[in-house]
A protein has these predicted regions:
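Polyanion-binding surfaces on beta-sheet-dominated domains and ring/shell assemblies
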Residues: 1-190
Length: 190
């Protein structure tokens, strides 16, 4: 959502947020749509939409990990790849990996590794591919939610179901599920 400079300045002068720009309460989330099985040829897949953000995740595996020197004899390996499609934002982004997408891949891998139990799959790999075709705000959150659903859809054992939400701060007030205008105006998620 585009927010003119005048509106941003007005929000700052008035101490911001007696209510949020889109009318939500501070702790209210945007409408969400979650679906599994969106890619029939995948071992597991899901899509997650909130506000103007959509993420899709595909799971492949468990399958034998090659090269063999990367295998773990005690448990399987989880690999996560996160990417934003070039047309996902107003300012077209360069296709392919970026430092930001590699960092988010590692954060998602770390978060998902804490709940996934691959002890029953030694010497294997489970690959999770997250793509964001439409970005408003909270892309890593949408990606994590889609990935967790795709892992469950693939039947990968998990200790618990992972969920994520973006929280921002405005004038000492916490805002749950920040939108693009809030994210740009403050130090929000990303």
């Amino acid at each position: 959502m585009y927010l003119p400079r005048k509106a941003k300045n007005k929000m700052a002068v008035e101490g911001l947020y007696k209510k949020r720009i889109d009318g939500r309460k501070f702790d209210e989330v945007r409408p969400m749509i979650a679906k599994v099985g969106v890619v029939p040829s995948a071992d597991g897949s899901a899509s997650f939409e909130t506000g103007g953000t959509k993420a899709m995740a595909v799971v492949r595996g468990p399958r034998t990990l090659h090269p063999q020197h990367m295998q773990n004899a005690q448990k399987g390996v989880l690999r996560v790849s996160y990417g934003m499609m070039p047309f996902s934002v107003w300012d077209r982004i360069r296709p392919g990996p970026s430092r930001r997408s590699e960092e988010i891949s590692k954060v998602c891998e770390w978060a998902l590794s804490s709940v996934v139990d691959l002890s029953g799959f030694p010497n294997t790999v489970v690959d999770v591919f997250i793509q964001v075709p439409k970005a408003d705000a909270g892309t890593r959150v949408a990606g994590l939610n889609a990935a967790a659903m795709a892992l469950a859809h693939a039947g990968i054992p998990m200790k618990e179901m992972l969920t994520a939400i973006a929280v921002g701060k405005a004038d000492k007030t916490l805002l749950v599920d920040v939108d693009k205008a809030e994210e740009d105006f403050h130090d929000g998620e990303g």
